[in-house]
Design a protein with these regions (language model features):
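Short, solvent-exposed amphipathic alpha-helical segments in soluble enzyme
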Residues: 26, 151-153, 186-188, 284, ...
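Alpha/beta catalytic cores of group-transfer enzymes, especially the acyltransferase/condensing modules
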Residues: 13-15, 40-42, 104-255
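FabD-like malonyl-/acyl-CoA
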Residues: 1-145, 196, 273-307
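Non-catalytic positions within long, well-ordered alpha-helices that form the structural scaffold/packing
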Residues: 80, 186, 264-270
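A short, well-structured juxtamembrane/interface segment
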Residues: 257-265
Length: 314
């Protein structure tokens, strides 16, 4: 039964860890089955990688992406198998948008895993090690961050890449430009701005060529109309039609993730409950920060999963 007040969100890179979903897999066979299906598309044993590592490989973006896609769909299918309420809307953060579209039936898990492994490889190739950087900026107004990025982009590019919640923005671009932006932010009194352990500046213009090649690869995917609307990152809108959905996915790679807007769009559409489909609790935490009235819960452990099943049964 579809519940208008319920929306599900799928996390992106940063939520992976060795041993993720091990407990849920013991209780729900479909978790491991989902990883096995995704492995067919990715061409690598994703369950073994997620459980045993090596961690260095799991954290390489071309492997992180299919592993997290598998994890998101594993939790989604476990929820379906357990008879959980059907959400009225879906969204995913960056890579998580692909999981949302797989969950909605827009593409198969196997196709999705193949596509996001390629996406990761293209992203790595677009910014050789040491050329790109990203940093989290906390407690600063959007307008200030945007102004500083413009000032720091005199030689090289730095732009806002993720609008994660009010007062939490990730910037990205050429490494030297990111360093200049951090220095300027410090001069403007911003005390919490830290570089991230990420070398690929996703959601910045440096990914434009990768996006073009990703667009070409999308022609090899069998697309369907989503059975559940998906709010997409580029503009926090639901797009109608396969071509419009594809275009939004391509643009997502070089434009900022409007995550604050996505969560606000879910709430405006009537969502009061948000379930995080995947490992970790990043998105449920952001959702509560964006809208304190939301009942946002993680679903990635047996305890959290069962608690949400019980709380959202009616």
């Amino acid at each position: 039964m579809t519940v208008p007040q319920l929306a599900f969100v799928f996390p992106g890179q940063g939520s992976q860890s060795i041993g993720m979903l091990a407990g849920l897999a013991e209780a729900h066979a479909v978790v491991r089955e989902s990883f096995e299906e995704a492995s067919q598309g990715a061409g690598v044993d994703l369950w073994a990688l997620a459980q045993q590592g090596p961690e260095e490989q799991l954290n390489q973006t071309e492997f992180t992406q299919p592993a997290l896609l598998a994890a998101g769909i594993a939790v989604w299918r476990a929820w379906q198998a357990a008879g959980g309420a059907q959400p009225a809307l879906l969204a995913g953060h960056s890579l998580g948008e692909y999981a949302a579209l797989v969950a909605a039936g827009a593409m198969s898990l196997e196709d999705g895993a193949r596509l996001v492994r390629l996406r990761g490889r293209l992203m790595q190739d677009a910014a050789p090690a040491g050329t790109g950087a990203m940093a989290a900026v906390l407690g600063a107004e959007d307008a200030l961050v945007e102004e500083v990025c413009r000032e720091a982009s005199q030689d090289g590019i730095v732009v806002p890449a993720n609008h994660n919640s009010p007062g939490q923005i990730v910037i990205g671009g050429h490494a030297a430009a990111v360093e200049r932006a951090l220095a300027l932010l410090g001069e403007r009194g911003v005390r919490k701005a830290v570089k991230l352990a990420v070398s690929v500046p996703s959601h910045t213009p440096l990914m434009r060529e990768a996006a073009n090649r990703l667009d070409e690869a999308m022609a090899n995917v069998a697309w369907n109309e989503p059975a559940i609307p998906v709010v997409q990152n580029v503009d926090a809108q639901v797009h109608e039609g396969v071509q419009a959905i594809r275009d939004a996915l391509v643009r997502q790679l070089y434009l900022p993730v409007q995550w604050t807007g996505c969560v606000q769009a879910l709430a405006t559409a009537g969502a009061t409950r948000i379930g995080e489909c995947g490992p970790g609790k990043v998105l449920s935490g952001l959702a509560r920060r964006i809208d304190k009235g939301l009942d946002a819960r993680a679903l990635g452990t047996p305890g959290d999963f069962e608690a949400a099943l019980g709380a959202w049964a009616g």
